[in-house]
């Protein structure tokens, strides 16, 4: 999935010039901000950061704050540069790129996901947006560690930056084949893993 996310940076956005009441940003300037200034911002939130910069510039040059309607006009111009912001559509690209059948094409309110699609979609969502980061949680306790997959632990690491206590018995898995989560937990959480 990480390789797909890297390729997605070039595939997800069609850069265009933006002009608002005589103030213009070229596609190449927007691209420079997108790929160089805001690289620490998740991909689906990044254009919003570029847009905020443009709005600040417009307000400074015009000497007044823009009203909600004016900001909405600018917002549409920037957000329309995304080919899509639909996580399920992006997941379908991933599936098709790797030779798997796409999810059925349905409106968001009628979508039903298979269990095996839930965690990859959540991984994409938390990789592409800042949604769901739980910064106010100080400690997380996870029980039955043996029943979580590698991807589920990666998601937990993305969602929670706090300390964690992970409990379980690797010999009591509900999965068909036994996995030793202790082999991959240090890769996900780094050297912060202590085994008791």
Spans of model-derived segments:
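C-terminal, active-site-flanking charged/polar segments
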Residues: 1-5, 163
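Conserved helicase motor core of SF1/SF2 NTP-dependent helicases
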Residues: 100-101, 126-139, 146-196
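Conserved helicase NTPase catalytic core signature
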Residues: 4-139, 152-153
């Amino acid at each position: 999935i990480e390789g797909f996310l890297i390729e997605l940076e070039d595939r997800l956005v069609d850069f265009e010039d933006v002009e608002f009441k005589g103030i213009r940003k070229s596609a190449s300037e927007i691209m420079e901000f997108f790929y160089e200034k805001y690289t620490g911002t998740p991909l689906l939130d990044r254009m919003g950061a570029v847009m905020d910069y443009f709005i600040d510039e417009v307000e400074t040059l015009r000497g007044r704050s823009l009203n909600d309607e004016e900001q909405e006009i600018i917002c549409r111009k920037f957000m329309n540069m995304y080919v899509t912001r639909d996580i399920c559509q992006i997941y379908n690209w991933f599936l098709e790129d790797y030779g798997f059948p796409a999810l059925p094409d349905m409106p968001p309110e009628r979508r039903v996901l298979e269990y095996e699609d839930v965690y990859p979609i959540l991984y994409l969502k938390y990789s592409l947006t800042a949604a769901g980061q739980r910064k106010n949680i100080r400690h997380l306790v996870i029980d039955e560690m043996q029943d979580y997959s590698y991807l589920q632990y990666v998601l937990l690491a993305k969602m929670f930056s706090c300390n964690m206590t992970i409990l379980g018995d690797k010999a009591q898995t509900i999965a068909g084949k036994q996995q030793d989560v202790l082999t991959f937990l240090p890769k996900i959480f780094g050297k912060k893993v202590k085994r008791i």
